[in-house]
């Protein structure tokens, strides 16, 4: 889609939800994961989209797919890149470069239950955004990133620590 098409689409959705705020709340498509073999998992949704993960060989996996942790970082990088592109189009900024890199630091002792004082997930997350735009000032480009960090759904879920509700169904 062109910037103009994105701009028009976003404007239309914003107008619709402004006029119909009760329609903005929806249940997100669930992801269902099953073990394929060993530690290789297959996640699907109702549209039959498939996503695979696996663990490194050193921990008993087959190393046939990215780890779930990498998929989390990829989700954040993709979400931030999408939000930057949407906001740029909305503001009439044509991006010439956009690259979002997400890294993290983890301590595997948490994952492996070696030390209960160490978190199983990332200890921190770093985001590097490289961007350039036609006739856009450095301040405008920085504002795109600042805005995105306030509105990225994946970034929000990670930084806000969304409550989890776990149910178990024994079959």
Where are the model-predicted features located?
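Alpha-helical metal-binding/catalytic segments enriched in His/Glu/Asp
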Residues: 75-80
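Extended beta-strand/beta-hairpin segments
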Residues: 1-74, 86-171
């Amino acid at each position: 889609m062109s910037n103009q098409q994105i701009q028009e689409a976003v404007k239309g959705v914003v107008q619709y939800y402004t006029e119909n705020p009760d329609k903005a709340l929806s249940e997100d498509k669930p992801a269902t994961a099953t073990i394929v073999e060993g530690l290789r998992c297959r996640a699907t949704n109702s549209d039959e989209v498939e996503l695979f993960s696996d663990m490194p060989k050193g921990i008993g996996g087959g190393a046939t797919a990215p780890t779930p942790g990498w998929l989390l970082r990829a989700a954040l990088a993709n979400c931030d890149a999408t939000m930057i592109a949407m906001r740029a189009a909305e503001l009439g900024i044509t991006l010439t470069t956009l690259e979002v890199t997400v890294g993290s630091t983890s301590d595997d002792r948490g994952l492996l239950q070696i030390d209960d004082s160490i978190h199983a997930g990332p200890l921190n997350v770093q985001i590097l955004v490289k961007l350039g735009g036609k006739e856009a000032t450095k301040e405008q480009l920085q504002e795109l990133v600042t805005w995105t960090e306030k509105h990225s759904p994946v970034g929000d879920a990670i930084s806000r620590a969304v409550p989890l509700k776990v149910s178990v169904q024994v079959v």
